[in-house]
């Protein structure tokens, strides 16, 4: 790859005011000479003629020359900014490809070269794609934080503490267990406490960053005809779900994306939970339970016109079914307008009960404010964007850390501790790309836009 020069259109295909081409690689100087007639002044915008193979003008525009290593990719880079005609862009690309050893760039290849040439770490490279695909202001700001290296800083800080820990204990590795003095044992115990706190804080922040990227799954569940579909419609300001008086109308999962307090949330309407002989409806109910167990938050809708004892039984039965699940539950007491009770929120044993009318909209703003209150900790300028692979690697590192801590308590074996710390460093290093397989890189960068 390093011996090939690549070209791609940076701007979106189609007609536009401006079209930009980017070229990177060792042949870029030759491209500049053949297309521009010269190598432009480095890092200056130069008004240039773009020439074809007969030195006739194809277009006029701005050329930008970035000689290696001070460029996006760390290689020689040339950008041509011309008129955004698809025909002009195509003619320029064909002209550039006619030069030897030049090919079209693969998706994300410019960013991949930047990573491989040490211009950015893997987190920063991934955050470029996350910034482009951001759907809320908060996720865009978090992506920018990652691009600027804030996430990487915390990973490297933790890695440096691990390395420092290893250096301290490996200096004692040639001594017997009897010779390990009390002072060293105290140092190790202090280091364990320090690292434990660092891991927990970082894991909490990374989880917030993951929610910004992946979105939060909010499942709307309940018995048939409780008003689940009406709640989906009013929360999403749409008529996404069909609403009827017939029980079992909703049989499959209905998805609707909304933004709450800058966090992307996926609302999921589910089939009414009940015993039924209908085979198709039973499948829908099974899917509903599966989604409930996978969700971050359940809005469990209850028909408030039912008796108090019936409402309590419904709540108790549902909580028993998800007893071992960490999913957060809010009980939404719907049809409050029919009994003319007060609208509002009550908390019982830490669980919220909110009275609303999905038909009239009364009380729904209280529900929205409740959801916003739950998400408020995510709305923090210090949050950075995070991916599932980051969480996985951090979990692996933390699990190994807990294993190391337990093993040390039991055996006080310096060699085993040093080996565990080495494994932890490897897991953390994979997050920023210090130890990364080619398959992983291909998987990450193949999802990028062409031209990035």
UniProtKB/Swiss-Prot annotation:
Domain TrmE-type G: 215-376
Compartments, as annotated in UniProt: Cytoplasm
Keywords in alphabetical order: Cytoplasm, GTP-binding, Hydrolase, Magnesium, Metal-binding, Nucleotide-binding, Potassium, tRNA processing
Enzyme class: hydrolase
Cofactor: K(+)
Keyword Transferase tagged: no
Binding sites annotated in the UniProt record for (6S)-5-formyl-5,6,7,8-tetrahydrofolate: 22, 79, 119, 452
Protein EC: 3.6.-.-
Family classification: Belongs to the TRAFAC class TrmE-Era-EngA-EngB-Septin-like GTPase superfamily. TrmE GTPase family.
Physiological role: Exhibits a very high intrinsic GTPase hydrolysis rate. Involved in the addition of a carboxymethylaminomethyl (cmnm) group at the wobble position (U34) of certain tRNAs, forming tRNA-cmnm(5)s(2)U34.
Matching PANTHER family: TRNA MODIFICATION GTPASE GTPBP3 (PTHR42714), TRNA MODIFICATION GTPASE GTPBP3, MITOCHONDRIAL (PTHR42714:SF2)
Stated name of the protein: tRNA modification GTPase MnmE
Organism this protein belongs to: Buchnera aphidicola subsp. Acyrthosiphon pisum (strain APS)
